[in-house]
Amino acid sequence: MGERGFTSTQLAARAAYLLRGNDLGTMTSAAPRLYPHMWSWDAAFVAVGLAPLSVERAVVELDTLLSAQWKNGMIPHIVFANGVDGYFPGPSRWETRELAMHAPVGPQTSGITQPPVHAIAVQRILDHSKRHGRTTRAVAEEFLDRRWENLVRWHRWLATARDIQGSGRITLFHGWESGMDNSPRWDASYANVVAEQMPAYVREDHAVITDLSMRPSNSEYDRYIWLVEEMKQVGYDDAALAEKMSFAVEDVFVSAIFSMACDVLATIGEEHSKPNSDVRDLREWAEKFRKGVIATTDQRSGAARDYDVRVGRWISTDTIAMFAPLLCGGLPREQERTLLRMFEGTRFCGHPDLLFAVPPSTSPVSKDFRAREYWRGPVWPVMTWLFSWAFSRRGWAERSLTLREEGLRQASDGSFAEYYEPFTGEPLGSMQQSWTAAAVLDWLG
């Protein structure tokens, strides 16, 4: 790690300092300039990183997020910090408080969701609480008792409102809901979105990221914002969204995360004597969505695909999402071995030009690869963390350790960048990204 600049001790101290600097009191901004609010899956990963520092503060992070949960069970993808501007679209563009019957009374939120990684954060909080005294364990267990129903309602909403075809796969109505905003996965589906007349807007991201090659184009953004307008037209109603949205895609990666998270939450429920009916539902959803993921896979390689509901077409792309079955399991052994070889081979982690052996968001051999552009090529440390954690959970200790070691080598420059250029290691996007620091803290914790 020294060749990049910082020792493990120095890196952990810098990561902890960063999270303290981004702490707004009861929430952590995803990044101080580009993302000055709370993002849903960022908050879960931030809680993972806070847990080794302070179980109590990690609990506050998730409490704040769950306090913004919608009445139908949805956890919104943004909870806006009071008095903080500098992000578009903000509350005045979403208008969820005015238009959505299920929106929370207190916090201002967006009207879409993000990947359900929160059970993982709860598990890490409980894990770290066991290393401390009775008081800290009590804080974690009291949180679980208080928020168990919120977590189950969140999973129930995903399993019902977002499995619109009963396929065991989560349908997204906006690419932002995937967390992989401009991935090549969505190109064909976005091409069918026709942005009509809508109120003018100014992109705040260009004021922070001046190298526009790192960010989605203006024409892409028009489609993103038009989808928000479509949601507003139907008052963010679940049934109407399923019927009316121009963009409706079954996301195999989010579905795999959901299956995995259901199993994690079910195990937590069993260990903490939660209602048998909840645990049973969680296990059933885990199995249903695992089967839904496996049903998308290529017979030989095991690579997973998304599905465009609107045009009835499978979407095959050389992106990190093709490895969804490695998260949730369920593939026949030979297919799984083949998929692991692909993950570690020259199309992804083993590409000879990569500076670090971690998964790029899009394969360097793909025609869609762009080394500097967001989810079209760069390496995201939080994705390295997710695969490392999942591989450990699945009993692949050596593979998990390799990703951890390579991820730490990459992060040892101390920039805690949102993402990195895969060949040069140049930090890109937002600096001081909270979830990057959180991944480092968990790895070093």
Spans of model-derived segments:
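Alpha-helical support elements that line or immediately flank enzyme active sites
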Residues: 43-73, 321-331, 384-400, 404-407
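Long, repeat-rich segments with strong aromatic
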Residues: 244-275, 279-285, 373-399
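Extended glycan-interaction surfaces of carbohydrate-active proteins
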Residues: 2-38, 65-108, 168-249, 288-379, ...
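Internal, well-ordered domain-core segments that constitute the primary functional module
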Residues: 114-188
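TPR repeat positional signature
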Residues: 43, 47, 115, 119-122, ...
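Core register positions within helices of long alpha-helical scaffolds
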Residues: 49, 121-124, 128, 261, ...
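Short amphipathic alpha-helical coiled-coil/interface segments
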Residues: 151-154, 279-297, 404-407
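Acidic/polar, glycine-enriched structural segments that form the non-catalytic walls/loops
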Residues: 1-34, 130-142, 152-163, 243, ...
